[in-house]
């Protein structure tokens, strides 16, 4: 409701203050176009969910998910106390984070939805998000991106001298975003981070990431692109083969298990559509009202007042629309590259922001909508805080790297 109210105020201002008589027509057009987009997105998700939930059901029947959960049980007992020991949600959450980090969106979303449904089975208040669900959603919305291949592709298409020049800035900014999301939820939920088990896991993860980043930073642009493509596709296909092989070795009825999981994908898709339409239509109305332009004008005015460098403002359209729409943010990124030049400061910053933040409200609609959550509690605030830190970190890192 707040989106519609803000959009109304912005539209009235554009109509009365600026004489824009087309603003309400634009908002109505956006409303119906976003409703259409919701159905198109749902059709794509339907196929992906059906496929991956089928494979996941094989892994579940073979005991693979339970095995991963048992390995991670000591950590999850501290971060998500309401999740029982060896609960399959722990394994699914881990697989989702790995898929997100490697940029495997086609696998990450179905696995994530399966994890959210698993957490929902433990939720004593089905309409209200539990602490575990909030932590999972915020970490998903601010997920660490290790291989931002799509950003490199956009820069290469625009003729960048070195498409991977923003690789390290993106890694630093996305790390800041992920840490901000985690610590904000930990603060809200009073999670004890000084526990030896938590510290050990955090140090181990940080060490692995450091080694991986060090390895990637020494690759050339062409080698990094080739490695990214090889790793992503190999992991994706490797997961499928692993699920099938373990299923066969454990004498799981593979075909029957796949069909059972695929049917779950149909049920999830059917329940998700109303929530997706509601969120995307609200976002479309807000964008069409011009409210984001008002925010940009205010930021530019404040920067001028304090005599700050204002080059960063030219990249902020990408930052402002990214929480609402991934496609709109991509369009803003490409527009910035075209307008200012692909190797300009605004383009470097826009690319870094695009690679370090997530479509928060889309993630919220998909993950909570799939299980019927109506009250998100502090999930939205923590996710948006992570986005804000990601944007601020992007600005700081880009001034550090590119001056």
Predicted regions and their residues:
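Signature of multi-pass transmembrane helix bundles
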Residues: 1-47, 156-286, 305-306, 378-403
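Generic signal for short, ordered secondary-structure residues
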Residues: 94, 98, 133, 224-227, ...
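Membrane-embedded alpha-helical segments and adjacent helix-loop junctions characteristic
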Residues: 22-121, 250-339
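Short glycine/serine/threonine-biased micro-segments
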Residues: 5, 52, 61, 101, ...
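Hydrophobic alpha-helical context, especially transmembrane and signal-peptide helices
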Residues: 26, 38, 87-90, 94, ...
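C-terminal transmembrane helix pair
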Residues: 107-108, 115-155, 160-190, 316-403
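Hydrophobic alpha-helical segments, principally membrane-spanning helices and signal/leader peptides
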Residues: 32, 39, 88-90, 125-133, ...
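Mixed-charge, polar/low-complexity N-terminal
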Residues: 25-26, 40, 82-83, 121, ...
